[in-house]
UniProtKB/Swiss-Prot annotation:
Annotated source species: Escherichia coli (strain K12)
PANTHER family on file: INACTIVE RECOMBINATION-PROMOTING NUCLEASE-LIKE PROTEIN RPNE-RELATED, PTHR34611
Name of the encoding gene: ypaA
Stored InterPro entries: Rpn/YhgA-like_nuclease
Protein's name according to its UniProt entry: Uncharacterized protein YpaA
Length: 61
């Protein structure tokens, strides 16, 4: 494997991992918003999902 191939493979793996984390974060936001719609306490939702207030504010349409 050449250096270029190795770097390309590492870049692909890093991109995949970042995408997976972003997807998990988006799912946590969806769950949190659903919980809030159902009347859950905001502080408990933030604690359970490990999201920040800014995460919810930025995604609360």
């Amino acid at each position: 494997m050449t250096i270029a191939e190795r770097l390309r493979q590492e870049g692909h793996q890093i991109g995949w991992q970042e995408g997976k984390l972003e997807g998990l974060h988006e799912q946590a936001i969806k769950i949190a918003l659903r919980m809030l719609e159902q009347g859950f306490d905001r502080d408990q939702v933030l604690a359970a999902t490990q999201l920040s207030e800014a995460d919810l504010a930025a995604n609360n349409h």
